[in-house]
Amino acid sequence: MIDKSVTNLDRAEILTQALPYIQKYHDKIIVVKYGGNAMVSEELKQQVMEDIVLLHLIGVKVVLVHGGGPEITDTLNKIGKESQFVDGLRVTDKETADVVQMVLAGKINKSLVNLIQIKGGKAIGISGLDGHMIEAEVKDERLGFVGRITNVDVTPVLDVLEKGYIPVVRSEEHTSEL
């Protein structure tokens, strides 16, 4: 949407002020963590995706890593499963882990990829589970399938970036402990 109160001179000034940052971050990789609470507002989600596409179009290599806490909680509530938290972390048994994967992969990741593409970008959804990209160990037995990251293989992300796409990474990881 174009703000009609902004003149062409204003736009030129904005671009002039942005130029040093465009030059500094051109061809650099930045990781944007897009938390579930920031996804609650549809208007904010639209603006964030527009900003990500803009960064991509000016040559910044954006990696979008998303969560989905509120959406996961809503889905668990719909199936009658109450969320439990220990020290701010969701207790995740097998059933909860399945819901988390369904929400992150089947709903949020696909939605963000689609929105980026509607805004004019090219995106591919990937998971920390893909190719054991993100490995973890159990953080605390009381938390179930909640882990601490022990290794990240960035090769899949770099491959996606090299092909000119924005990787949209859902925050799931692999552990051999459970």
Stretches found by the model and what they are:
Residues 1-176:
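Nucleotide/pyrophosphate-binding catalytic subdomain
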